[in-house]
């Protein structure tokens, strides 16, 4: 099988698995606990719950899912990537279909366990989608668009959106549900932060005598540039060079392994980068 075809098949399979996990999580944990996840999924469940409780109208999850994702999907096609958006559409439609089709099943009625384990599962499923260049839809499209095309950190925007959802949920369905939903969202975010590292940056300081070779190696491995700085060892007063570069967190280990192979004597200091200004190459999404 052609390598590209094999890659796309694997991508589709992972998207399907993630959709199944999200749908099962909604039917077992989220619905049982009456929780409202963050982002578009939380808004969909909130709309469903409002219509069901106050208007006695049952709206299929799929219908709300498609309607709320219309504009984000357009943004994805127009500004992010067609394959990326098509895979995301697969996740959106399959998640909606399975959520409407699967029977509800109660694993536990303990709301704290539901909040924690539901959040763990949700974060894992979202990270699966992101690792294969897809999203679960909704605010994910907007977040990626703002961060990649406009250079805007969408965290505060998404946070504000979630606060509004939880405030409405608290007023209509009880503040205990809103507070437990915060635990769900926090757990999900922490799992996502651990598993998906592409948007996290790592700074490398490499003291070496093979600076040119290592700079080229970093570029060949990550397409990131490097800066070479002359330096002197304080103890032995020996001359060295420092290779300074910033890479994505998920590229960090592969760069360090490659540097070790090129120069076993290199001294490497790797540290998290909290803020970065200026041009930083990001792999195109498609």
Q: What positions do the PLM features span?
A:
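Core subunits and conserved enzymes of cellular information-processing
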Residues: 1-211
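Positively charged, small/polar-rich N-terminal and surface patches that mediate targeting and assembly
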Residues: 27, 55, 117, 158-161, ...
């Amino acid at each position: 099988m052609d390598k590209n075809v094999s890659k796309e098949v694997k991508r589709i399979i992972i998207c399907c698995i993630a959709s199944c996990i999200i749908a099962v999580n909604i039917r077992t944990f989220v619905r049982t606990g009456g929780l409202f996840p963050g982002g578009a999924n939380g808004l969909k469940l909130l709309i469903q719950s409002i219509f069901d409780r106050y208007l006695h109208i049952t709206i299929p999850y799929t219908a709300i899912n498609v309607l709320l994702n219309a504009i984000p999907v357009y943004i994805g096609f127009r500004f992010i990537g067609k394959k990326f958006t098509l895979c995301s559409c697969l996740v959106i439609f399959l998640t909606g279909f399975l959520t409407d089709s699967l029977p509800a099943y109660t694993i536990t009625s303990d709301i704290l366990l539901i909040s924690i384990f539901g959040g763990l599962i949700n974060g894992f499923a979202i990270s699966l989608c992101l690792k294969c260049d897809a999203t679960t839809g909704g605010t994910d499209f907007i977040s990626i668009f703002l961060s990649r095309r406009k250079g805007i950190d969408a965290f505060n925007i998404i946070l504000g959106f979630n606060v509004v959802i939880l405030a409405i949920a608290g007023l209509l369905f009880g503040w205990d549900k809103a507070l437990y939903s915060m635990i769900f969202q926090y757990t999900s975010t922490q799992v996502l932060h651990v598993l998906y590292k592409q948007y996290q940056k790592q700074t490398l300081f490499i003291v070496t005598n093979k600076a040119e070779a290592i700079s080229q190696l970093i570029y060949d491995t990550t397409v990131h540039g490097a800066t070479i700085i002359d330096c002197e060892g304080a103890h032995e007063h020996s001359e060295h060079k420092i290779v300074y570069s910033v890479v994505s967190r998920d590229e960090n280990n592969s760069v360090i392994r490659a540097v070790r192979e090129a120069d076993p004597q290199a001294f490497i200091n790797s540290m998290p980068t909290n803020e970065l200004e200026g041009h930083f190459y990001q792999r195109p999404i498609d």
